[in-house]
Every structure is written in structure tokens, then in C-alpha cells.
Amino acid sequence: MERKNLALLCAGVVCFWLFALAFGTAQGSGLRRQSPAVQTAVQPQGPVQLTAEPPALELPCRAACLIDQQTGTVLYEKNADQQMPIASITKVMTLLLTFEAVHNGQLTMDTPVPVSEHAYHMGGSQIWLEPGEQFTLDEMLKAICVSSANDAAVAVAELVGGSEPAFVQQMNARAAELGMEHTTFRNACGLDTEGHLSTARDVAIMSRTILNTYPEVLHYTGIWTDTLRGGATQLVNTNKLLRRYSGITGLKTGTTSGAGVCISASATRDGLNLIAVVLGAPSSSDRFDAATTLLDYGFAAYRAAPVPLPEDRPLQLKVKGSTEETVPLDYAALPATALLPAESAGQLTVQLELPEALEAPVTRGQTVGKAQLLCGEAVQGEYPVCAAADAPRMDFDTALQLLWDSLRGVAA
């Protein structure tokens, strides 16, 4: 028995030195075998190919843009890159930066918002704030989203940015980050100011960003009536589509002498979320008619088809050279639905491209493969499959400890 144990121990020592030699060579060479997994993030592609030119819609406005909220696909456009004032639709960016401040912990919905002399002197639509008066951020957001209050927008801008000019700098920086190439903000509320310009396409980008990132904004934009000051101040939503159009959820209206009458309207039906931007309409009724025409077209021409995640998809992959044997997979990048033409008869399928194993180290969130979304044989989009946990590389000390524990078990 002692001879047998001795032989096993010797064999273990030999294995150890062979392991150490191999490990040391791999480390010393500075070379790593590349995993067959995709090494860079797969960017989602346009999920729908428009098969035909859209019809010429009669739109009583200077510019318009209709997009799918999920993908950003442009479904219809009219002078979408023509710069013009956008009035109170400007407040969408003010709201976006405010929700970001809440998300980052800078503010809460209960944070008191002071009213400065500057905010007090705002013209246009307002709730007649008085200097020194305070409302919670939640109340100010109601005033902005429901009544389009300029004084409330400026007061919030001063709270978030320290001053309105500093906040406007943040607005322009954020617009640049979003790719709003033809937008320049000069104030936080949208009053006509020289150089305060945007486009229908840029407004669609801005609207999509806040709706996808902070859908809680719809809690405010969907309010028809409310009150402030203990019921003394009545708020009535400027977006009359809330009462006229099935599925409308928001988002923001705007009217000035320079901009005309405008709206960025969001609506959802049967899982399809659309954003219709109308700029420079001659009247309020024209604004709502144009938005209705755009939304009607979008809901009639397109549908949201459910994306079927394969039932036999791998839930984990093996990892070589790690303390972890496997790493779980994350398919969250795949959308729940995909945009298709309404008449499309093709069935959606998902084709996975994954390696048999990964090479350590693997970090959580790392792209390890991709999922192709197909409609028939046509590729509708590509999405990353990611690691859902870390799998660190096994270092020499860990390997030695594991081998020692194994030898002790054999000797025992």
C-alpha cells in the first residue's frame, strides 16, 4: 500500500512539474491563444429594409419625421434636416438632463426647486412662479410636461446646472453626444432666440433617447389635468391628442411665433412604439392632424413581430484556463420585438454564432458571440451575446494550491 501511495505521489509531482513548465512557457512567451469568440461588440443593424417608397402624405407643416422608437428606423420624413426653431419641444432635452441628474443621485423627486428672479421673468406659457417660492421636482416636472411652463423649466435648469447658461452648455454637449448634428440650444425652455435651432430628425433622436432611457417620463406626459398650490393652480395638458388618438403617450408640444406650431408625439399600439415629429405647422389643429396622419401611416404600414429566442440556446460556455469551469450567457441585447412591414409573411428566427469554449480571462459584459435576427433568409439585425459573469485566468499560485489539495487527497 505504501508503494502504491508513493507511486501516486511521484506521478503527481511529475504532473506538477509538467504543468508548471507549460504554464511558465505560456506566461513567458507573452502570447495568448485567441478565443474563437467575437472580440468586438456587435452593433445592432437596421432591423427592417423598407421595400417601397412611402406614399406622399399630405402634411400641413414645414418639416416632419416618423420613426420606430425601438430601432430608430426612419419610416417617413419631410425636410427632416432643415434647421428651424422648435419652441417648447426644447424642453425634451431639459427633461432628459433632469432625469439623468435624478438617475445619478444628484436629485430626487422630492428635492425642493427654488425660484429665482430670472425664472420669474420668463415669458410665454408659465405657472406664474414667484421669487422665493418652492416646489418639489416632481411638481415642477408636472408643470413642464403638462402645462409647458417656461418658468418651471428654467428653475429646474438652474437647479441642475447651477445657472441657465451653464445648463445650456450641458444641453449642447448632450446633443452632440446623441448625434444631433444640426441642433444648437440657446435656452432651456424654447423661447425664440437667435441661433436656437434644431431639425425634425434631431428632435426624433432626442425624443427616442428619453423615451427609451427614462420611460417614467410618460407618467408626466400622460397626465391630462392636475393641480398645484393645493388645487389653486390648474394644469391642463397642451397635447390634445391625449383625448383624441388611441395609444398616444406623449410627448411634447411647442408654439412660438418663430417656430410655428409643433409637436413630438409618441404612441403605442400592439407592441409598436412610434414617434411623430411635426415642426412649423400653421395652426394647432394642423399640428395634430399632421401627427395623426404620420402615426396612422406608421401603424398601418408596419408591425412589431415577437422575436423568438431559441429554446435550445446554450445557457453557458466552457472556459479554458480559468478557476471557473463555465460562464453563463446573457442574451438581453436581443429585442423583444422587431419591426417588419405589415404585409411581410416571413417568420422571424434567431441564428446563434458561439464558440465551443472561451479562453480565460472572461469579464462580465464581454461579447462572446452574436445572434442574427432573420426574417426568412434576410438578416434583420445582429446583436451581441455577452458573458454574464467573470471567469478569471488561473494564476500559478492558484494552480499550485489546487494541485497540492489534489495530492493531499490522494495521499490521504
Q: What positions do the PLM features span?
A:
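Conserved, single-site charged/polar hotspot
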Residues: 15-20, 312
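Sec-dependent N-terminal signal peptides
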Residues: 3-16
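Domain-terminus/edge residues, biased toward the C-terminal soluble/receptor-binding domains
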Residues: 180-184, 192-197, 201-412
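Active-site-adjacent loops and short helices of periplasmic peptidoglycan-processing enzymes
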Residues: 2-6, 22, 26-214
